[in-house]
């Protein structure tokens, strides 16, 4: 750059010689005439203008201007950019990152005496003054590069003001065609030139200049119009970009209609560059011969916002945007953080594992197609790292677009994974995945997983439930099980594996519904809409609408041995000044005693091996725990589980409407299996990258818990059985009477059965005998008459003889029973036919 090494010339020397106050007289008078020629006839007006000039502030700083924010994930262990977000499309660059051609074009095109003046071009002002006096207009403004920089800085400051009215006033003051504005601009330009070097001013100008639309700065313009960096701009490209700044509305390269006017101005600038000796004749001729058309202009549309983020990470990008209010690195309060984010320049390094994200996102699109027309099918997959709360995966089956430019069933700006306040929906009922919090509270109260409870569906009075938060409840509550044959007693472990509704209601009847909710809250569980958790009896079976992210983090707390970590999405932030700032702190606390968490995990492991979650199991050698969830009519389906390293929640269901997924067939599989297929696919990749080991064993004290062994009641009378159970803290309920060989009214069997463990206070169901059965007595070896008598005495009424011939040598056995049908010891009805085989020497 020929002029870049020049010292300040005559204008600058004049300013230094005369001093700012004397120079202000010249500038003030010239400005007065420049912006309002009619005022020139009045010396009083000129004097007034000088007074105004002297009273104006003379302090202005070159500050960092709004820039792009960049969001990064991790791919193959290295950062990868997934999104660019900005209020203004600008990337500030350093002096050595700008082409010499661009530096020269700016000076040649905007302020050829830039290196010779003291912030304002006195010659230019004089020339413009003469022109304006002659024409009676204010056509020529004679703004130097420094003045233009001042104006742009003031415009940027105006745009940061909080209200529309304040911004309007400030913008008028910064850019309006008024004498006051021009005088102020001149004063500040003179001051700026005294404070900063020419290089600093020129670079700041190139970084702040507007190039049409929302594009600011030479780097963003180079990328948008030529798909290159500012450092690599050619002479023709640089001159074309500088041609834009005076009149972007008619010279911007965004519109082909502007190409002719842009070329005309470009060629003028190239001529000045040649005249100044900044380019050779050959360079000039080559540049002028370069057309401004679609062959040379390469439009690269700015990809601003999450709609233009990586296709695999758009919803996570939106979650980061919504989480800015939580990033303490950006400021002391949410308002400051939002303002700093708007100003930009931050590089945000997130927790997202791009490798896992890609797998989960592809599975969501393939297995749960949002284009499905038979229902509004939605799905979400969220993975959270155990022990840290770091969000590794956030995928869903729709395509993100918050611009309104696309529409259809497959498009949504709603993030199914998150709470409503973070761009999410109102959440979805989690069904039986919520039962785990009853299991945990059961263990917290000293109960064991081998205790047996009634698993039958039935109707109970809601007044029998304890709820210290919102009770008492009134009216009947009717509930059933998923399978018709699920009834009778179940151990808590078996009920967990098979997801037996009745068993968990029985457990909750021995607990406090409020305390169950508190256990859930300790693991971060809350409603997605922000309302308090409901605690009515049906809440045990999962009626509170929650976000998948919430459930994934809660299960991660169980997998960690009881340490809950709230979900975080940002590892670190690099500020506009290059300083490393903290990300989101892992806010962890002990939510559960390790004995409780490990015993619950022990029960949850059976879900994956022989229970309702078996279809989700990757069977890759990594131990998993989990729980399935299906709401009424299978409107919503869930699979939530974890290894020792990562927890994953998958929701598949109706975004709106009530189409049963069990009746929905897609790709040869019913809708209720989609969750399993997505979870299995995701966790296969998770386990290969984050291999998890064995879970700790259950606490021995919580296997039996505080339960009591049920005694053997068979053969006891009801009073005897009642007394024995009462002494152990149980109650007795007769559920049926059956045919039995035991005396009428005596106990045949109990549920839970003898030897099982039941909670103190449990009702033990018994079945009694009606006495209509008898055991076949032993009659073989008796004389037929004696055998018949014994059978008659036992109540048998139909007896017949079958003659078995004897050899003469066995005459001593004549008349003896050699066999009976049925055989001895068999339980039969007294009305059944009894056949006796009798040996006879003569049949």
Region roles according to the model:
Residues 134-159, 301-309, 447-516, 576-606:
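Conserved catalytic neighborhood of penicillin-recognizing serine enzymes
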Residues 70, 76-91, 220-224, 245-256, ...:
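Short pre-catalytic segments that frame enzyme active sites
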Residues 687-843:
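Ligand-recognition elements built from short beta-strands and adjacent flexible loops
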Residues 108, 144-151, 203, 232, ...:
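Structural recognition of the beta-strand scaffold that forms the well-ordered cores
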